[in-house]
């Protein structure tokens, strides 16, 4: 898209602030992983493996987490809700990750729950082997795949995985956010 998506505005706040506000309803700690983070009220962690793509960012999030589990959300998924994460949290017993499946049947590893210890160990090993895909991590640990049919009845479920990759996507997100407010 040519710009830092985390700082795009939706409802007069950055995507990062918007997502953090949602997460603060279910946790008291939100950490942003990356460079040039301007949201001063949030804890910031740097990538351990800079420029290693999504798996590197995921590793940075897991490495920075001080709890048993981490909720990981990409900065370009501004329509996630508390209800989605509450449902995912109910599914974690006996698993290392809980990952929703999008309507197009693809997993969404950047909107998921991760048990820190096993996932960090596997993410480190995968990176050291030259791997870059979060899906490699999900296949290496005990993953609970949550089908879209299990979450489709949640409020706003059709919007959860609308990520912002183009200026047109951003324009549509602004319109959708305005429509959801009314």
Model-derived segments and their meaning:
Residues 168:
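Adenine-nucleotide cofactor-binding loop residues
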Residues 165:
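Active-site rim beta-loop-alpha module in soluble metabolic enzymes
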Residues 1-131, 136-160, 171-181:
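Nucleotide and nucleotide-moiety/phosphate-recognizing core
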């Amino acid at each position: 898209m040519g710009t830092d998506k985390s700082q795009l505005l939706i409802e007069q706040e950055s995507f990062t602030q918007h997502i953090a506000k949602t997460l603060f309803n279910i946790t008291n700690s939100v950490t942003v992983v990356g460079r040039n983070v301007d949201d001063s009220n949030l804890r910031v962690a740097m990538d351990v493996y800079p420029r290693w793509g999504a798996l590197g960012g995921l590793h940075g999030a897991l490495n920075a987490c001080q709890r048993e589990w981490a909720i990981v959300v990409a900065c370009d998924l501004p329509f996630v809700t508390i209800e989605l994460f509450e449902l995912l949290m109910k599914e974690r017993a006996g698993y290392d990750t809980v990952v929703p499946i999008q309507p197009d049947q693809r997993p969404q590893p950047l909107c998921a729950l991760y048990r820190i210890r096993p996932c960090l160990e596997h993410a480190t090993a995968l990176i050291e082997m030259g791997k870059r895909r979060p899906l490699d991590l999900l296949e290496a640990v005990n993953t609970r795949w949550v089908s879209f049919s299990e979450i489709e009845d949640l409020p706003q479920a059709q919007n959860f995985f609308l990520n912002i990759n183009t200026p047109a996507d951003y324009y549509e997100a602004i319109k959708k956010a305005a429509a959801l407010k009314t």
